[in-house]
Amino acid sequence: MFKSELLTQGFSTLLNNPQALLFATFGVMLGIVIGALPGLTATMGVAILLPFTYGMEPVSGLLMICGVFFGGVYGGSITAILLKIPGTPAAAATAIDGYELTKQGKAGLALSAATFSSFSGGMLSIIVLMFLSPVLASWALKFSASESFALATFGLSIIASISGESLIKGLIAGVGGLLIATIGLDPMGGFPRFTGGFVELMNVPFIPVMIGLFAASEAFRSMEQNQQIRQGAKVAIGSLLLPWQTLRRIALTILRSSGLGVFIGMIPGAGADIAAFVAYNETRRFSKTPENFGKGEIKAVASCEAGANGCTGGALLPMLTLGIPGDAVTAIMLGALTLQGMQPGPLMFTDHGDMVYTLFVGMIFCYFMLLVLGLLSLKVIGNVVKIPGNILTPMILALCVVGTYALNNSLFDVGIMLIAGVVGYFMQKGGYPASPVVLALIMGPMAESNFRRALSLSGGSLDFLYTRPITLALLTLAAFTLLTPIIRKIMRLRRQ
């Protein structure tokens, strides 16, 4: 049960601990910078900071990690909108419409909407975390391998919605992504598949592929055209004030997408990237003008960021109440709590209730700082789009190389990134979208591993596909999502 007296005590504790507030602010700012840099993720930032929290006061150390987590999820949207370079996997969905708005001279609108949506989604997720954590976490525990497979299948069906003008080309790109996702260690047997003898391919190099498809390919195209890296580079960011009319228009979208993000975040293995794409798809499905998506729809930007940041609180739910991390970041945070002598789980709310509620208050503070620091830093980070193309193009390529190399100190990863960049360049020329490839790389391993696990648990029978209500509902929704664009196209042709 929610205890208001502990929340009040948490406020008092935090107000009397300026050091914790300072470290939380530092964490948010560091997270924004890390998220904005291609190849660097919130997971990496949290992992690097983890050893330093051991000698720190518990609240300060844990809030600094929370700040990096929250800021990292949001930071990827900045370069995704301005340069179509997703700083994080979750920002790949934001880039679809965010960059189109930049090309239309509406970069300021897109950035302010992304910042406010990130703040709102994160705040709503923390409120849910405070009030409903025991109930929601126990419900999320019902997701077995079959439900997780169905969720991944639903995620893959979203390819139909993000394929742009050609569904066939989008599906081809998605199949290509699924094939790439099979490279590496078999999820059940542990033996290498399609690695060609390269040890580096034991795990699919997802981040290098994403950087190559989205960033390097754009730089290659710019060099061919011998012009500025983007037409958007000639456009000032403009006002960062979000108009009241726009706020009213996206309010329901933010609320719905935040809820989806919280729900998806609670499911182990489903992170902010999945939440962003699912929120994008659902917003498009509910929209009266779905044809505007992919062409600069502000609701799309709001939905992706609200969903991704709503996932943060959702991922913390099972970690804090059941000791089950929702994603890689919360797994590291679980380690941080253990280092501080606290064992996440049901007993944590009774043994360390005051600490838990102090963290809740600190998380709210982190999101307020994200809103303030996010808006203040946009102009600084956004100045990159004013740099001439003959300077910016080599800078972007250098950033791609450095960011990729920093992942594992591996030149092999750099080679993978450059190959993906060349492939992405030819995909652009042929009209094949890159987003389905990224989505398939995210969802493919999750779908395969959970399907095989569910098949093993059912003794080789496929009855788990239709005997479990949640699994059946998600698979039905996936079929509906996949068929909707086809039905719409047929109806459009009939009208003509």
Residue ranges and their predicted role:
Residues 1-61, 134, 141, 192-297, ...:
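Helix-loop-helix hairpins and the membrane-proximal interhelical loops
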Residues 28-42, 71-84, 159-164, 258-268, ...:
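Transmembrane alpha-helix interface/packing and boundary motifs in multi-pass membrane proteins
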Residues 33-43, 81-91, 124-128, 264-274, ...:
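Short helix-coil transition sites and intra-membrane helix breaks within transmembrane domains
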Residues 42-52, 65, 80-100, 131, ...:
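Re-entrant/interfacial helical elements at transmembrane boundaries that shape
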Residues 59-63, 100-117, 288-300, 328-331, ...:
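Membrane-interface alpha-helices at helix entry/exit sites of multi-pass transporters
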Residues 69-80, 87, 297-322, 326, ...:
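A structural-propensity feature for long, helix-poor, extended segments
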Residues 70-75, 116-128, 180, 302-316, ...:
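Membrane-embedded alpha-helical segments of transport systems
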Residues 112-227, 339-493:
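Membrane-embedded alpha-helical modules
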